[in-house]
């Protein structure tokens, strides 16, 4: 009997080809798009977001072409609770969150897997660029063959059970090959551009989005230097992130960068570029994949943001499941709320949320 797989379809080329590849491999494939959009006309009219209305239409057409069933699953309330509300609160708290990581953790590989099991599916699958392998008695998450498109940074929260029941067929290919396959089999999405912005923010202006969502909690305040001297006025801490230089609206006769955001005092601290280079951080909400718990100090490479190159670092276990990360070389703009992800060569060791910078 064929193994059944529920493929999360975004309407893009990657998940479309993932569904095709799995059908070719002999799986009983079902396509599904997570309905996450809110009751918002601008949101619903938006083109190209990963789960927008146009994405649903694209996904449905792909499933028709591949001759597989297609469903739209209502994740609206769950997405708001687990992703949007947390995103807004984190910015109000002076942090810079990564909503894609939360979506992967709570929706795509947790709730979607539960829904898949509810219809008798053995697996969920996505178009992510990453690989899953079983070595000895442990499932591992491995970097994609396409280094530029590798998405493991956003996938470090996997449990062993989730890895055992997840398929990622695009991880064995480069993006150019995925587009070639889509064109060869006649998929109209073969040249659809990649979605890079936050899917639920139509103009990619997160500050405006949060100000409209919580108008009473976003207030102007002071730009200050590290000694507390007032340098000017800011329009609300949600508009800024560590390392930011542009868009400050200040003319001080020298380049200044955001070095800290203090939610308690509603202040944005500015300093020189040297001030944003640090070597140590504390991470919380940590998950490890090759082992359950960090028992001793280990050497890894680590990324502090999606676009960063992995840098040599030491992991030191701390109480309450937290870890200290010490980089060999200073890192630019380590940011609270972002994730730090650990690697052993191509293997994802794990990751966590940056809680503080030392």
Swiss-Prot record:
GO molecular function, one term: tRNA binding
Primary residence: cytoplasm
Gene Ontology CC terms, in alphabetical order: cytoplasm
S-S bonds: 103-199
Name listed for the protein in its UniProt record: tRNA-specific 2-thiouridylase MnmA
Annotated function: Catalyzes the 2-thiolation of uridine at the wobble position (U34) of tRNA, leading to the formation of s(2)U34.
Family of the protein in this entry: Belongs to the MnmA/TRMU family.
SUPFAM superfamilies: Adenine nucleotide alpha hydrolases-like (SSF52402)
HAMAP family cross-referenced by the UniProt entry: tRNA_thiouridyl_MnmA (MF_00144)
Residues at the catalytic site: 103, 199
Catalysed conversion reaction: S-sulfanyl-L-cysteinyl-[protein] + uridine(34) in tRNA + AH2 + ATP = 2-thiouridine(34) in tRNA + L-cysteinyl-[protein] + A + AMP + diphosphate + H(+)
Keywords of this entry: ATP-binding, Cytoplasm, Disulfide bond, Nucleotide-binding, RNA-binding, Transferase, tRNA processing, tRNA-binding
EC number: 2.8.1.13
